[in-house]
Amino acid sequence: LPAVLRNGLSDINVWLWQILQAEVSGEAVPAQSLCGMNAEAIRLVSHDPMKYLGQGHIVPDVALGPNVALLNWLRAQAREVEVAYVQVGMEREDILASLNRLSSAIYVLMLLTVVAESGRDISKVGL
């Protein structure tokens, strides 16, 4: 696995544990990050990946490889959790916002994986 994918998955794991801890403890969800990017950076990259990564938006395709396919599945699952959270009437805005950002973060990780797996130097991206 590319290092960016390993590190990103570790960050996603922490993100999920922080949501769980906030739900159980009643405390606020702490600021979360992905590969050193805060929520605003994740938003910027997810909205304009060409500007920040030199990579346009992607549509999941078998040609992108199994890592991106699995990340897309994970992103779909994150969206399902977000929808279910609303449908069951949960009202914690911080958790809902975190779940929403999670799917964006996974999309950014998909983009980073495409960049890394194409042999481009991920350390040179404009973040």
Predicted regions and their residues:
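Phosphate/pyrophosphate-binding loop motifs in nucleotide- or prenyl diphosphate-using proteins
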Residues: 1-127
